[in-house]
Amino acid sequence: MPNENAEVRTANTEAGRPQRKENGRRPQFKRREPKEFDSVVVSINRVSKTVKGGRRMRFAALVVVGDHKGRIGFGMGKATEVPDAIRKAEEAANKNVFRCNLVEGTRTVPHSVKVTHGSSTVFLAPAAPGTGVIAGGAVRNILELAGVSDVLSKVIGSRTAVNVVSATLEALKSMRTVEEVAKIRDKKVAEIR
């Protein structure tokens, strides 16, 4: 008889079910692994759809994730409840992560850049060490999550969160280090500087 129970336990484990302890209970909680990325909710927007019975409310969340080491991403999620929208946005952001080029040592952007998305234009420029992140709103959140410590920025035009975030991330994607530019032009780094 005890052998049959042992076979059942191994079958349950192989099927993906948790193995029962001696007292017959399942383990209660598993420890969560530390998150790979930190996340910031940039905006939560309540949207409504008018139907025959009245208005149907939903929420749209915009979330930015980053590891403070040059990896950054953003995502949007929609749901009938705010926590569900945030969770969906985080999942989407984790799928859209990319690495941005930063100047080693000073942790600033390699060169100035101006990117337009929709009616929002974002300008980023390198800054001297000790300057800090001179930015506001969504741009500050993105730059801090990316690990930028010294940068100057300006948002021109519309301050719509989605457009500002898209323009800022496009600006970070377009950054090229001196070494990359030298390789593209078939020149030495000293000739570029």
Predicted regions, residues:
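Ribosome-associated RNA-binding proteins
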Residues: M1-R193
